């Protein structure tokens, strides 16, 4: 899944960007995943939400790590580099996630404020 990329996220290397051309239903296939971009065109904020068919999952786990996967620290590249298709849908909003200590602080504050 993807959502719109905010301007403040363009240079943030903790935010994975997905290169996708979406159709009129806001669906498409990922072409690439990167951490650094120069332009927002066809790039979206990647949301690490996956579903697999049993056959695809078995194929994926039996593939060796690729250079791009290791170099970029992005497991999605194993699939892309091995010509597996990753279908993408665009969501209206980015659900909260915890990938960094800063994210954890934001989530804790969110829960604290909602429980007051």
Feature locations, PLM:
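Conserved core of the sugar-phosphate nucleotidyltransferase
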Residues: 1-66
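Conserved alpha/beta core of the MobA/IspD/sugar-nucleotide pyrophosphorylase nucleotidyltransferase superfamily
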Residues: 43-116
């Amino acid at each position: 899944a993807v959502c719109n990329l905010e301007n403040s996220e363009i240079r943030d290397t903790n935010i994975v960007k997905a290169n996708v051309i979406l159709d009129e239903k806001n669906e498409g296939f990922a072409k690439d995943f990167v951490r650094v971009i120069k332009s927002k065109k066809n790039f979206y904020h990647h949301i690490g939400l996956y579903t697999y068919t049993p056959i695809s999952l078995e194929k994926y786990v039996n593939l060796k790590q690729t250079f791009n996967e290791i170099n970029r620290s992005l497991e999605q590249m194993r699939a892309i580099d091995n010509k597996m298709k990753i279908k993408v849908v665009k969501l209206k909003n980015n659900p909260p996630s915890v990938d960094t200590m800063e994210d954890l602080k934001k989530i804790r504050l969110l829960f604290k404020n909602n429980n007051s």
